[in-house]
Amino acid sequence: MSQALKHFLNLTDAGGDAIAAMLNDALDRKSARAGQPKGKADADAPLGGRVLAMVFEKNSTRTRVSFDIAMRQLGGSALILDAGTTQLGRGETIADTARVLSRMADAIMLRTDDHAKVEELARHATVPVINGLTDLSHPCQIMADLLTVIEHGKALPGLEVAWLGDGNNVLNSIVEAAGLMKFNVRIGVPEGYESDAGMIEAAVLAGAGIRVIRDPVEAVRGADVVVTDTWISMGQAHAEAKLAAMAPYQVNDALMAHAKPDAVFLHCLPAHRGEEVTDAVIDGPRSVVWDEAENRIHAQKSVLRWVFGQI
């Protein structure tokens, strides 16, 4: 593998300085194309002629659409491979898939339940590999979240972020971002549903303030940003017991009242309205989830430019 090859499997693959540069690039490029048709290429078309192979082992709306549009706006193109309709679904190895796609595409994005698969893909690919979501982390989503927070006038260093609910892959990447960008996270989570302990330890060592708090009110008190996600993933067992444990952590108006008056609400979507969040919050004035969803495009454009060595 070439020393110059860049993969984006976790936020730590880039580091804080590169993340800051990508966020600045995303802000600039988004502003520069304001009002343009969404399928129109940016004036400089920096990825002209490049092809992104998108491999999906999990269903997707936002990841699929945002990467496709991102490549179009950068002057390139994207193709979709669903595991169920390719040889991956019939037993072809990740290593062989990596070798083949490296000969046919300029970069590969994988969305999968198993983080070990994206790591194996990167080991055998000779083109950049991007994590579109795994069971461990969701770095592209957090790039969009950080971009959204900055757009709404909040500086990352010293930011107080409150997470409510399941300690999942999205939270793992928020914790990782906290260590890199020097902000704090209060994790409001019931016992037994905590996030990855290794990622928390690494973030604390890097300078983030990470606290696990059982009381949802204390987790949210004075927060600049309140974040949640779905409690039950597709096919997850023991759903009734988990829903009961999570119920006190629902983000509703009463809970949001304990955050700062100018706090914003984030959710990566899709939302299970009435479970982890109420209609009043997600549709309310402090919700920025639709900006957050759009920003998947703009953040991922900069991630793509970074893996190709343009940032």
UniProtKB/Swiss-Prot annotation:
Signal peptide: none annotated. It holds the Pfam family OTCace_N. L-ornithine binds at residues 169, 229, 233-234. GO terms for cellular component: cytoplasm. One of its GO terms (biological process) is arginine biosynthetic process via ornithine. Pathway: Amino-acid biosynthesis; L-arginine biosynthesis; L-arginine from L-ornithine and carbamoyl phosphate: step 1/3. One of its GO terms (molecular function) is amino acid binding. It comes from the Bacteria. Coiled coil: none annotated. Keywords: Amino-acid biosynthesis, Arginine biosynthesis, Cytoplasm, Transferase. Its main location: cytoplasm. Carbamoyl phosphate binds at residues 60-63, 87, 111, 138-141, 268-269, 296. It catalyses: carbamoyl phosphate + L-ornithine = L-citrulline + phosphate + H(+). Its EC number is 2.1.3.3. It is found in: Cytoplasm. Belongs to the aspartate/ornithine carbamoyltransferase superfamily. OTCase family. Reversibly catalyzes the transfer of the carbamoyl group from carbamoyl phosphate (CP) to the N(epsilon) atom of ornithine (ORN) to produce L-citrulline. This is Ornithine carbamoyltransferase. The gene is argF.
